[in-house]
Amino acid sequence: GETLPYRTRSSELCYAPEQLDAGAFRDAFALCFSSACLLDSPARLTHLKAIAAARDVGTFVCYAPRMTESAPFWPDAASLRETARAFFPQADVLLLKSSDLFPLFGSHELRTALFALFSGHVQLIFYSDSENIHLFTRSVLLSAAKNDLTEAELLYRLCRLNTWPDKLAGLRESTLRKLLF
C-alpha cells in the first residue's frame, strides 16, 4: 500500500462508510473505539456512521482516546488532540486513563478536564490512574482503590444492571457502587 510518513495504509483506514452494515448494531450492547483509526481517512467517516447507527438502536457509544497508544499512528500531536477532543461529545461513556490527560489538556489534573469532558452525549466517565478508579456522572463522583475492574467489566456490569444510554443521566450513587464493587 501507499506509505505515509507516519503510517502505512492499512485495511482499517480504507474501510469506507458504505461498507458498514448498520444492522450489525441491533443486537450489540456497545460500540467502543479509540483514536488510532480516526485519522483523516475513510475510517473516520465510517466511525461517524457507526456511531449514528449505534445511537439509532440504543447501543452504548464508548470512546477510549488512548492518546499514548494512538500517537505513533498520527502525523503530529496537535491533530491527534484536536480530533480526539472533537469525538468526546459523540460518546455516552468515556473510558480514560491518567496517561490521556496531559496529551489532551496539557495538565495531569483531572479537575481541569472534567468540564470539557461532559459535553454532548457524555453521561459517564470511567477514569483510572495507578492507584484509583473513578466513576463520574454529571452529578455523582465515586472513587475506589484500584481493583481488577477493567473497562470491559464495567460495560458488562452496565449490561447486567440493564442500564442503557437513555438511563445513564439518572444513575444514582448506589448504582455506581454496584458498578465499582
Residue ranges: model-predicted function:
Residues 2-142, 148, 155-181:
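Ribokinase/PfkB-type carbohydrate-kinase core domain
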